[in-house]
Regions:
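Nucleotide-activated sugar donor-binding and catalytic core shared by glycosyltransferases
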Residues: 1-238, 243-366
Length: 366
């Protein structure tokens, strides 16, 4: 039996969280697959943390990260460096994930060399090319050149069908990010920051998106601080992104507030367990919108659009935008209205059962 050579290409922390379960599933089936892992290093330190947690060792590391890198740098470097790897390895299929510049450039490189692409987390859409930016363009572009579409939900599948993608190439698998939680969330987990927050309602915050930099981020932080002043039984932890512009805004608005700790980015195992310990989550992240519902945590999404409307429809997520008064109102309501809180925390999870990787590998084996 000839083995199928599958290459997985990823470069950021969120991609790694969702691709490592797939790597490990492929490696349980060595009689069917030869698995090749190529990382671009788009997010160097944060990527390496995730690889360690899941025990994944890359076969190729393009090591593209450099100080002050732009979208031009990432796209050009991945495109040029991946060419040699693809020509050397000659994979039967290349799997990319989601909406990053790594995924876009890798898919384009595969297209130029006529290597089939499988898009994990295909079909997500906001239908606004600049929100989120550049992610909405990236994922649409990847879907143009893909041969396999692994859609996390029926709504994602419908987006692809609406764009004319053939139904025979679309599989609804659930989201591999839910698979990751099965590895990382642990009974009896402890951490000094969680011990500090014990006895309070813990608010977990993440905020880093490009389109929120500047005044929107300042508004978000001011709203959070106002609400927490009103609710002295809360404590907040904000694992802050490495982006210096994010750090500047956070320190300007939040420094000196003793019940809110700004800490360095957490490794994925820690972050998932912080989510499990939290009362609610405020975020502008994509992946957290999928992971938190699996843990029964309400999520306020500080964005104007989301490519994950299933969570909004299910009631686990609420879009609150970036206006200070709106965030203040909705955050206050969740802390004050137990009925609202219970409704959001017990809503159904639309993102799968934690076995998406197995389904994807079954398709590739077919």
């Amino acid at each position: 039996m000839t083995k199928k050579k599958v290459m997985l290409v990823f470069g950021t922390r969120p991609e790694a969280i969702k691709m490592c379960p797939l790597v490990n599933e492929l490696k349980t089936r060595t009689d069917e697959f030869e698995t090749v892992v190529t990382v671009t290093g788009q997010h160097r330190e944060m990527l390496d943390q995730v690889l360690r947690v899941f025990g994944v060792t890359p076969d190729h590391d393009l090591a593209i990260m450099k100080p002050g890198q732009t979208l031009f740098d990432v796209t050009c470097d991945v495109l040029l460096k991946l060419k040699a790897v693809l020509e050397d390895e000659r994979p039967d299929v290349v799997l990319v994930h989601g909406d990053t510049s790594t995924s876009f450039a890798a898919a384009l490189a595969c297209f130029y060399l006529q290597v089939p692409v499988g898009h994990v987390e295909a079909g997500l859409r906001t239908h606004d090319i600049y929100s989120p930016w550049p992610e909405e363009f990236n994922r649409q572009a990847v879907d143009i050149v893909s041969e396999y579409y692994f859609a996390p939900t029926e709504a994602s599948k419908q987006n692809l069908l609406n764009e004319g993608k053939p139904e025979s190439k679309i599989w609804v698998t659930g989201n591999t990010g839910i698979d990751a939680l099965r590895t990382t969330v642990r009974e009896g987990y402890s951490h000094p920051e969680l011990e500090w927050a014990e006895g309070s309602r813990l608010i977990l915050i993440t905020a880093h998106r490009r389109e929120n930099l500047g005044e929107p981020m300042h508004r978000m932080f001011r709203a959070i601080r106002r609400v927490m002043v009103d609710h002295p039984d809360t404590k907040a932890i904000y694992p802050i992104h490495m982006n210096p512009l994010v750090r500047k805004a956070a320190h300007e608005e939040l420094d000196g507030f003793e019940r809110l700790h700004i800490i360095d980015p957490l490794e994925v195992l820690d972050f998932h367990n912080f989510m499990a310990a939290s009362h609610l989550i405020l975020t502008d992240s994509g992946g957290i919108q999928e992971e938190a519902p699996s843990l029964g945590k309400p999520v306020l999404v500080m964005r104007d659009t989301t490519e994950r409307p299933e969570g909004v429809a299910a009631g686990t997520l609420k879009l609150v935008g970036t206006e200070e008064d709106v965030i203040y109102r909705e955050f206050s309501r969740l802390l004050s209205d137990q009925t609202e809180y219970e409704a959001m925390s017990h809503a159904s999870n639309p993102y799968g059962d934690g076995h998406a990787s197995e389904q994807i590998v079954d398709v590739l084996a077919g």
